[in-house]
């Protein structure tokens, strides 16, 4: 399939996707009933969409194109409430979080979709192990060249995005010791991590043509990079975050990404180079392992500081752009989060340490999502 022309979008418009867990009380294991909910909820949706992901325990909700985070919040809230009503009708529950703490990947049913069937044929058991749950954020761009500049700029902040939403410490009934274990599920994929270096949209067209010509991919959907351009939507899509436990957190991280995008494309503070990515996997690992306490190393100076310190130092620089986008509340929430020692991952560990069960943890997450 040829690469679509880059669709010109209004700059800094937003789209948000959330992959949610469909669970089956009273045991709170993952259900295999996403298709039932999706079919039931369609007639209620007036904005956005609810759709399949790769397995039947995953339900994805997505906004349309949104002007700002308030617009996105209204859309997501309406979809959330419609899905909640459908779940109640079928005696199911919904929750966030990047991973289910005790599900068996072997029991996950692949959704009835030709693309997902092909994915299983290609990736085997890795596809079922990818029953993990993430948030994606699209930011509108006016041109392909803007999209490539923005992609490289946002790549500098991948550890920040991972750490802010890290909510997957438990996997296979075990404390992984990671704040975000979800991304480890993709480490065997050949396109895991950052996009190969290109300098501009013409370079990206050459890259896509080469990958297509060598039969590595059929379309953009076959590329699972941490951040990727989406020419058909005219966006850059950030794909590294766990689905958070609350809709509010999903909105806050989207507003933070939108604000960073506005700053990056307005001020052009960086001259991007291939060497920018030299320490990318190391800094990304720190965010997955330690969350906001992870240590970032500057690729040129060797200076080190924590992710939470970097966020706090960025805040003043970003404040005027957040105001311009009506995202000040989101930036302020991210700053409060960076100052707080109580991460979602640590709160999950504390729940278990205080005598809670893994099924009780999922039940709590369902209550949080429904609140």
From Swiss-Prot:
A GO BP annotation: modified amino acid biosynthetic process
EC number assigned by the record: 6.3.2.2
Top EC class for this record: ligase
Catalyzed reaction equations: L-cysteine + L-glutamate + ATP = gamma-L-glutamyl-L-cysteine + ADP + phosphate + H(+)
Pfam families: GCS2 (PF04107)
Keywords: ATP-binding, Ligase, Nucleotide-binding
Molecular function via GO: ATP binding; glutamate-cysteine ligase activity
Binding partners and assembly: Homodimer.
Functional note: ATP-dependent carboxylate-amine ligase which exhibits weak glutamate--cysteine ligase activity.
Sequence similarity: Belongs to the glutamate--cysteine ligase type 2 family. YbdK subfamily.
Listed HAMAP family: Glu_cys_ligase_2
Matching NCBIfam families: gshA_cyan_rel, PRK13516.1
Protein name, entry field: Putative glutamate--cysteine ligase 2
Organism whose genome encodes this protein: Klebsiella pneumoniae subsp. pneumoniae (strain ATCC 700721 / MGH 78578)
Organism lineage: Bacteria, Pseudomonadati, Pseudomonadota, Gammaproteobacteria, Enterobacterales
């Amino acid at each position: 399939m040829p690469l679509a022309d880059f669709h010109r979008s209004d700059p800094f418009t937003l789209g948000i996707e959330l992959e949610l867990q469909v669970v089956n009380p009273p045991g709170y294991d993952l259900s295999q009933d996403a298709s039932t909910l999706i079919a039931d909820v369609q007639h209620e949706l007036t904005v956005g969409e609810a759709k399949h992901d790769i397995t039947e325990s995953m339900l994805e909700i997505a906004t349309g194109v949104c002007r700002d985070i308030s617009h996105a919040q209204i859309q997501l809230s309406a979809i959330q409430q419609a899905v909640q009503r459908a779940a109640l009708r079928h005696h199911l529950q919904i929750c966030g979080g990047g991973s289910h703490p005790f599900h068996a990947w072997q029991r996950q049913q692949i959704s009835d979709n030709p693309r997902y069937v092909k994915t299983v044929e290609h990736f085997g058991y890795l596809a079922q192990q990818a029953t993990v749950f993430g948030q994606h954020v699209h930011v509108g761009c006016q041109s392909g060249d803007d999209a490539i500049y923005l992609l490289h700029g946002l790549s500098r902040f991948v550890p920040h995005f991972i750490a802010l939403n890290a909510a997957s410490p438990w996997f296979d009934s075990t404390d992984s010791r990671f704040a975000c274990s979800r991304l480890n599920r993709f480490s065997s994929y050949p396109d895991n991590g950052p996009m190969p270096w290109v300098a501009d949209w013409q370079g990206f067209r050459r890259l896509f043509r080469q990958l297509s010509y060598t039969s590595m991919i059929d379309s953009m959907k076959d590329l699972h990079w941490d951040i990727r351009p989406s020419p058909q939507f005219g966006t850059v899509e950030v794909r590294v975050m766990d689905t958070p436990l609350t809709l509010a957190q999903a909105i806050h991280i989207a507003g933070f990404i939108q604000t960073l995008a506005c700053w990056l494309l307005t001020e052009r503070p960086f001259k991007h180079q291939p060497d920018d990515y030299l320490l990318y996997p190391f800094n990304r690992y720190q965010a997955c392992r330690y969350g906001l306490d992870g240590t970032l190393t500057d690729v040129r100076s060797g200076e080190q500081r924590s992710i939470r310190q970097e966020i706090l130092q960025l805040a003043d620089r970003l404040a005027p752009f957040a105001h311009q986008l009506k995202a000040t509340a989101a930036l302020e929430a991210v700053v409060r989060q960076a100052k707080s020692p109580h991460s979602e991952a640590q709160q999950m560990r504390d729940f278990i340490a205080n005598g809670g069960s893994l099924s009780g943890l999922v039940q709590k997450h369902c209550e949080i999502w429904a609140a």
